Amino acid sequence: MADLFDEFIEPGVKNEIMDVEEAPENPMEKLDSAKKRQAREDMTNLLANMHNDVGVGNFDEATSKRARVEEEEEVEEARMENIIVHTIRTDNENCTHEVAIPPNAEFAELRENSGTEPAKYYPFQLDAFQKQAILCIDNNQSVLVSAHTSAGKTVVATYAIAKCLREKQRVIYTSPIKALSNQKYRELEEEFKDVGLMTGDVTLNPDASCLVMTTEILRSMLYRGSEIMKEVGWVVYDEIHYMRDKERGVVWEETIILMSKNIKQAFLSATIPNARQFAQWVASIKQQPVNVVYTDYRPTPLQHWIYPVGGEGMYEVVNVKGEFREDKFRDAMSGLATAGDSAGSFNKRRTGGGTQGDSNVLKIIRSVASNDGLNCIVFSFSRKECESYAISLKDMDFNKDHEKGMVKSVYESAIAQLSPEDQKLPQILNILPLLRRGIGVHHSGLMPILKETIEILFGEGLVKVLFATETFSMGLNMPARTVVFTSARKFDGSDNRYITSGEYIQMAGRAGRRGKDDRGTVILMVDSAMSADDAKQIIKGATDPLNSQFRLTYNMVLNLMRVEGMAVSWIINNSFHQFQSYAKIPEIDKKCVQVERKIASFNFPWENEMRTLVDLQDQLEATRQRIIQIQREPKYIVGFLHAGRLFKVKSGDRDFKWGILNQFKKEQNPDDRNDQIYLCDMMIAINTEGRFDPTNPATLVPGFDLPKRRWIRVPMTIDRITAISAVRLKVPADIDKPDGQMRLDGMMAAATKRFGNQIPLLDPIQDMEIKTVEMKELIAREKSLEGRLETHSMTKRDNMKDLKKQFEQKQDAVKELNALKAERKSVQSTLHLEELNNRKRVLRRLGYLGNDDALVLKGSVACELSASDELILTEMLLKGIFNTLDVAQTAALLSCFVFQDKCAAPKLATELQTCLSELHEQARNVAKVSNECKMEVMEDKYVSSFNPGLMDVVYQWVNGATFSEIVKTTDVFEGSIIRTLRRLEEVLREMINAAKALANKELEQKFEDARKNLKRDIVFAASLYL
């Protein structure tokens, strides 16, 4: 066998952490008495709202504060335990009704509305859950309504509004996004007339009895103690499950905590598994009964199909009864293209929206259309894919001539408000031919006026096929007959994972129009093998729980400290995050008892000797890991990436043993434009008993040691390599055929036999010429550790493996117990309290608080800034950075605070680059102070979060350039540009208020001029809903 391979050894080829309590002397520390009085007046109503709530009081001494915190912890734990939940009988098995009762309240039966006219009548028969929710409102009790998309939750909202209007109270309807607020305003204004809108961008009829607003506006009103809140009877929270959003969920939590106990709240939510827990939390902090009306009944049942990419036809895997059909799922997986067909795709990167993807979508749309399945929403997780798929339907037309005319009429009416030049923008012109044929696109990169036009056309049935991203599923009432998913996976910023059941349910819920369809159809495209368990988890799994995303912000801390006597820990103790944490204590205690018993059961006399042995083994493993990490560096390994070389490879915890390199290539890192990655086409042996996909490592099971194995080609990065051999094989050309597989098996057997199962490795120093000091020390350390292990007393015991196993089991149990105890301690303590103290240190160091923690002028300025980074903006204001900038430069610099998309780095003029450098300098200073005060901040990451990608675009826009001119200078989507400019206008409004707080008329005028120059043309075209 010697002629089958060539064996050769290749020739030479600490910062000190400061805990500073004292604030620096600052001439701005003393707050003007008039401004101090105003700050107190702003918060008077907030304090009144919180009357008798935990945490309000004047505690000057640190010891008093600590005592209060400990008392609050005990109260919180007792309070949670005393929330009693009663079940209320309903006449419908599809509807459950529970009510959470706090300790100071008594359970009372809800009374029917006898002798009093209902606040509102409906021209249709109400569902059971709607009747129960209305009963709660008639009894003036807060209620959480948890039901599927399109189930009819809006009925509950309109009833609460009608009740308030009848009783001469004001009512607030709040939603998570401005687009939804605009749409709701239109709907409610048509019905009730006395309706206003407040979104930041637009304020209409602010004196109305019913106010529709974003949650951020509501929070601002609560912090400022708005007089309006005194007149409010009910607040309706639409899409309350949005509270689990990582970025903005905290805003919802703040508003609920700050809301007066006298105001009743109606929460509208998609189905959530922990609805009861949420109600218990609200009941505990508001000390009032909170009802939960829950239904998983879907008026229009769903039918779920899988379309295997590369196969023929679709397979019904879940029928309208909700039964998962295992046989059909197996058929669908068999319909997938075979793994062999996927092999050899190393040089064809799998990107969505390519020819293959387009053709599969085309097949599905044709099938849906021929089976009377229109209208249809096609969800894709990429904006570019949405457009590519829409363009691929170039030969399809779903609209009749009269419908084309109606589309043109709506389209022309929509864009009539635009200037003639804006009407000729490519995005405006290019969308019309698609719309006329009944095809639409909806994603964040579209201009708002186009998104709204498409929404209206879709709602009117004039767009039959809509390609949309996930955001279309949130809030907007746009049901369809059919929903299609172009993939079961999505990239979430860090991982290309399966979509969660909650995400699937939210989007799939758009299928099935109530009163029009007898069923909704959902089609899931699957392009790689998946297990039945994964499919069940996605299609039939539970919805995502409503988990708190509470976090402290400097704006929150400063606003709560504007009034003397306000304990900031009050909002922490009343957070849903704290409530959920306390709920874990009983389960933690139960686990602790179990683990302690397990530890006591071990009888192990040689524990100390085994501990030293394991420690040596761990040190050796760590040393070897560092050696291979250095060997894998491109400057060392690339010269040894030869076809046929054997490499040991691992993927996660799966060890594939020896793999054989076929070829490698260098590519740009998609996450870092300045970095490159090395992609190896590696042949590895896998277990062929189950389904597998070479492009999806998660489906591969190691098979090197199995008699029945298969060699396949798998693309992998060099960080999967764990050892580099000195052996190269002559790889058969026909590796994908049985004969080639047999020959490769023979080569590997011969190599293993020749070297006695010890295939030689390249020596890092002698062969790879890595002659660094670190490598020499690592090799010496490796030899020393190997010698100490050979002479260790425990290695000579016959039962050493069994003893080590027992030792590791005990150690794992000890680690588990310590982790449980640490978790309980963390849960028992006031969460975020340490972070709060650290944030206060930062604020004192930077001069926002005095030594007595009283707010000074700088802190009052920061209170005005909530739309972006309040600290950096305040630092720049107080250091005069904006003083020397002109209006356009000011706006351009502020754009760095609001632009979030990725784009090519712009070439900036010297003036813009200079002011950007000043921003970065302030960011580094704040990061430095934060780290010194134990608020850990990754300095480089923090600095790079201020994105200059649109600085030049904003500079041109504020100087009068047209939209058509600025879009030519960037690769950023038009919709993203408009969204950034609108968010920038929000920041400028706050900067005007901040300049007023400083009594700086010149800066105030500069920000006002920038805002005026910004607000024009298509960027601020009025919403079609208004």
Curated annotation (Swiss-Prot):
Q: Might you name a Gene Ontology BP term for this protein?
A: RNA catabolic process
User: Which Gene3D superfamilies does the entry mention?
Assistant: 1.10.3380.30, 2.40.30.300, P-loop containing nucleotide triphosphate hydrolases
The enzyme's main class, written as a single word, is hydrolase
- List the record's Gene Ontology CC terms alphabetically: TRAMP complex
- List GO molecular-function terms, semicolon-separated: ATP binding; hydrolase activity; RNA binding; RNA helicase activity
Q: Where does ATP bind?
A: A147, H148, T149, S150, A151, G152, K153, T154
Residue ranges of the Helicase C-terminal domain?
360-564
Concerning SMART domains, the annotation shows:
DEXDc, DSHCT, HELICc
Q: Where in the cell is it found?
A: Nucleus
The UniProt keyword set, sorted, is: ATP-binding, Helicase, Hydrolase, Nucleotide-binding, Nucleus
SUPFAM superfamilies per the record? Answer: P-loop containing nucleoside triphosphate hydrolases
The Helicase ATP-binding domain sits at 134-290
Transmembrane ranges, per UniProt, are none
Electron transport among keywords: no
E.C. no: 3.6.4.-
Which family would the database say this protein is a member of? Belongs to the helicase family. SKI2 subfamily.
Instruction: Write down what this protein is called.
Output: mRNA transport homolog 4
